[in-house]
Amino acid sequence: MSKRTIQLNCDMGESFGVWTMGADEEVMPWIDMANIACGFHASDPHVMSRTIDLALEHEVMIGAHPSYPDLQGFGRRSLAMNEQEVSEIILYQVGALKALCESKNGQLSYVKPHGALYNDMMSDPSIFRAVVDAVSCFNLPLMVLASANNQDYLDIADRFDVPLLFEAFADRTYLANGKLTPRSQPNAVLSSEEAILNQVRQIARYGKVTSSDGFVIPIEADTLCVHGDNPNAVSLIARIRAALDE
């Protein structure tokens, strides 16, 4: 079976003040889509601006990466918020990044929520609806987790005329239900480069992923998430790019 054309996306701009997170300058040339943090889980106006410059330099698509307001927990903790509050934090963060992009004659191309907000969105229809409602104000696509059954998400998004981009993960393990293994559980992240590359090839060539307990799950992904915050990130992402181009 021929491989699917899949773009690489990566979380970027997650430094804050004098604290540095990730290897953005080294990773950016290898990716197609940069999910730029918007200040609520990481980043600040200067980091956001600098990361936009870097993406524009390398002709990488720019996406907003909003989260719950949780700097201390890096946006990985769920917060009890109603639909209006969720929509408001999305509007606030995406609006800020969009303004910075436009100040540089750049274009914001999509939205991908971060961490706990992403997970909650994929498990709670009310949160998903709140996110889609906010994203619809910008006329942008929303990036969501590719799963065996995407129809429920498509139905909600269609009501708001929001296109969906479906993503898979290169280095995260999957449960039998097609969801990501929570980071709180053991083996949530693949540590072997060969295991990561095998998963990438399976997704790209066959539209499938094997769960941690051996179930083969059909998924069709438009984009593949890679991570740039580990010591071997640059060399691994280069190998992933090569695997996609095989």
Swiss-Prot record:
Highest taxon in the source lineage: Bacteria
UniProt keyword Hydrolase present: yes
Alphabetical list of InterPro entries matching this protein: Glyco_hydro/deAcase_b/a-brl, LamB/YcsF/PxpA-like
EC nos: 3.5.2.9
UniProt catalytic activity: 5-oxo-L-proline + ATP + 2 H2O = L-glutamate + ADP + phosphate + H(+)
Keyword presence, Hydrolase: yes
UniProt-listed Pfam families: LamB_YcsF (PF03746)
GO biological process, one term: carbohydrate metabolic process
Gene3D superfamilies: Glycoside hydrolase/deacetylase
Keywords on record: ATP-binding, Hydrolase, Nucleotide-binding
One term of GO molecular function: ATP binding
Subunit annotation: Forms a complex composed of PxpA, PxpB and PxpC.
Protein role: Catalyzes the cleavage of 5-oxoproline to form L-glutamate coupled to the hydrolysis of ATP to ADP and inorganic phosphate.
Family: Belongs to the LamB/PxpA family.
Protein name per its UniProtKB record: 5-oxoprolinase subunit A
Source organism per UniProt: Vibrio cholerae serotype O1 (strain ATCC 39315 / El Tor Inaba N16961)
Taxonomic path: Bacteria, Pseudomonadati, Pseudomonadota, Gammaproteobacteria, Vibrionales
